[in-house]
Amino acid sequence: MKRVYSKIESIAGNVITVTAQGIKYGELAIVKAKDTSSLAEVIKLDREKVSLQVYGGTRGVSTSDEIKFLGHSMQVSFSDNLLGRIFDGSGNPRDGGPSLDDNLIEIGGPSANPTKRIVPRNMIRTGLPMIDVFNTLVESQKLPIFSVSGEPYNELLIRIALQAEVDLIILGGMGLKHDDYLTFKDSLEKGGALSRAIFFVHTANDSVVESLTVPDISLSVAEKFALKGKKVLVLLTDMTNFADAMKEISITMEQVPSNRGYPGDLYSQLAYRYEKAIDFEGAGSITILAVTTMPGDDVTHPVPDNTGYITEGQYYLKGGRIEPFGSLSRLKQMVNSRTRDDHRTIMDSMIKLYASSKESVEKKAMGFNMTKWDEKLLKYSNMFESKMMDLSVNIPLEEALDLGWSILASCFSPKETGIKTDLIEKYWPKKETY
């Protein structure tokens, strides 16, 4: 069967169309231009008309260039040699190291059989009180970090990568600025975590369509390590860039647009990636944290809106902090009853009092007279924000719970907190005054 063709029917954006026979959906090809060559993937079959997206872009490609079909979908090498390495969205080395061609696995396979999944039951400690105490990250959970441009979401991912108690970190970067890419690399290297990390990075300077492979290649490698018993945390940034690349291809293919120009299968495409999160019985697990930027801080934007229906909660990053209102880990109840007996009480009581303090903050801003209770709430608000919400805080869960008691005792009497007497007697600091 003929596998090499030398006539391109049309070129539209990063998509080329050729007439070919015996080609499979998702099959890879090499487009050989005059001075370079680039990988391409079959994204549409219409009888003998085959459409391919060219990962390196179509700049310099002419209709007389050669297309060689490879007979397989995209593959990536899998072994422990991946650890500490940095690759692009196609699995090629970005760090100047050698190419890895052994033990190739195909990417983008189906999600694991639901019968192989076990109920989430283990906490992933991050050292961040706003996660560990108030919205616990659970092994095999899938959670987005909703944010706007300019917030330190990549810095948050770096903190989690350095501090999370997992075996392996896989970073999938889509549309990363070169400075952000270097920050990730340098921070993990200085923190001693690069040796347990694997990077698949698409930068803003790369072809847009190459970002489409980053989640699939990251999650395929994660799945193989999880089956070997590793606890894997996959950090993806930014899923909105991923969706925008899908939108660009959809427009090029002249597909009927859906909400705000995004393809009609946006939900399915996002769900397909997030559903890779799993805890394998008798093996390891995959946990997914994915940054999703909200254009104009609009949570009804199609990308965050669809994401919210797929994931098990979300973290909101506002003002450089994880916002306690709106952030939610729907699986936290699976684990925080088994951490310490005061965990849920501290979580509920501190958030309730912090919500009350917001009214006192508004009263002060509007010039109203402040009661003694208002003054206590204002003091509490300041302590809570500086000692609990600040992303620079790095303390174990037990120390964070003790800190919560200390903050409460510094601002209130035991009766004012509404906490049960047995917990007050067990944990209330003896030397604090209010």
Curated annotation (Swiss-Prot):
Keywords (A to Z) from UniProt: ATP synthesis, Hydrogen ion transport, Ion transport, Transport
The GO biological-process annotations, alphabetized, read as: proton motive force-driven plasma membrane ATP synthesis
Q: Which residues form a coiled coil?
A: none
UniProt KW Ion transport keyword: yes
Membrane-spanning segments: none
MF annotations from Gene Ontology:
ATP binding; proton-transporting ATP synthase activity, rotational mechanism
Gene3D superfamilies per the UniProt record, alphabetical: 3.40.50.12240
So what does this one do? Produces ATP from ADP in the presence of a proton gradient across the membrane. The V-type beta chain is a regulatory subunit.
**Which PANTHER family does this UniProt record tie to the protein?**
V-TYPE PROTON ATPASE SUBUNIT B
Name the UniProt record assigns to this protein: V-type ATP synthase beta chain
